[in-house]
Amino acid sequence: MATMKIKKGDLVKVIAGKDINNEGKVIAVNAKNNTLLVEGINMVTKHTKPSMSNQQGGIVHQEAPIDASNVMLIHDGKPTRVGFKMDGDKKVRFAKSTGKVID
């Protein structure tokens, strides 16, 4: 399994799919499936039954996972590809467009 280039809290732009050109913040990362949950992106309608914990039930709108290959990290206001390099003895992410270290 490869290292995820996108982390929780990153600002990303969707480059493929129904929400193309939209931007959002990463809520969750699933490295096993290579998917992300992005705030306000890939919204689905879920119908829930009333239960003990959810007395009301009804229709809920929530984010569905989107593949990590369909988003690009936004760095300095522009989408960029992400690479890894060694900074001393630490492995850090860097923006391939500018060469600057991201974190």
UniProtKB/Swiss-Prot annotation:
Protein name: Large ribosomal subunit protein uL24
Pfam annotation, one family: ribosomal_L24
Role description: One of two assembly initiator proteins, it binds directly to the 5'-end of the 23S rRNA, where it nucleates assembly of the 50S subunit. One of the proteins that surrounds the polypeptide exit tunnel on the outside of the subunit.
Keywords: Ribonucleoprotein, Ribosomal protein, RNA-binding, rRNA-binding
InterPro entries given in the database record: KOW (IPR005824), Rib_uL2_dom2 (IPR014722), Ribosomal_uL24 (IPR003256), Ribosomal_uL24_KOW (IPR041988), Translation_prot_SH3-like_sf (IPR008991)
One GO term (biological process): translation
Family of the protein in this entry: Belongs to the universal ribosomal protein uL24 family.
Gene Ontology molecular function terms on file: rRNA binding; structural constituent of ribosome
Keyword Ribosomal protein found: yes
Self-association state and partner proteins as the record states: Part of the 50S ribosomal subunit.
One annotated Gene Ontology cellular component of this protein: ribosome
Species, as recorded: Agathobacter rectalis (strain ATCC 33656 / DSM 3377 / JCM 17463 / KCTC 5835 / VPI 0990)
